[in-house]
Each structure stands twice: as structure tokens, then as C-alpha cells.
């Protein structure tokens, strides 16, 4: 599974500005989803890879980013 890293309180994606390989996104994805996951910056949001099937990713149901 893959998807955008999301803040469960706000419903917002984690923003990033250095597109492609991005240490911040890698670190945040690993912290949220475990060390087997990876991440990079895609369309100014952290995109996480190698997630477990039940991983919660953006968008969250009934929660908009405000």
C-alpha cells in the first residue's frame, strides 16, 4: 500500500518542498508506519511506500484539512 502521510488530528497531508528524494518524508513515514516503509516528496506532500494494508493515509473520511 502507498499513500500520503496524514495528520490524524487535522486531516492535512504532511507538506514538503524538496520534491523527490526527501529525508524529512522518509523519517516521518518510518516514524508513523514502521521502519520497513519509505517515503519521498510528491506534489508537495509526503508520499509513503511499503505500508501495511490497514495503514491510515490521506484523505481521512469526514475530516477536511482546515
Swiss-Prot record:
One of its GO terms (cellular component) is extracellular region. One of its GO terms (biological process) is defense response. It is found in: Secreted. InterPro entries: LCN-type_CS_alpha_beta_dom, Scorpion_toxin-like, Scorpion_toxin-like_sf, Scorpion_toxinL, Scorpion_toxinL/defensin. The modification Asparagine amide is found at residue 66. Gene3D superfamilies: Knottin, scorpion toxin-like. This is Beta-toxin Css6. It comes from Centruroides suffusus (Durango bark scorpion). The lineage of its organism: Eukaryota, Metazoa, Ecdysozoa, Arthropoda, Chelicerata.
Amino acid at each position: 500500500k502507498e499513500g500520503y502521510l496524514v495528520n490524524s488530528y487535522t486531516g492535512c497531508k504532511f507538506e514538503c518542498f524538496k520534491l523527490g528524494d526527501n529525508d524529512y518524508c522518509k523519517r516521518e513515514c518510518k516514524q508513523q508506519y514502521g521502519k520497513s516503509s519509505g517515503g519521498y516528496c510528491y506534489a508537495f506532500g509526503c508520499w509513503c511506500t511499503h505500508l501495511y494494508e490497514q495503514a491510515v493515509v490521506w484523505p481521512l473520511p469526514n475530516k477536511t484539512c482546515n
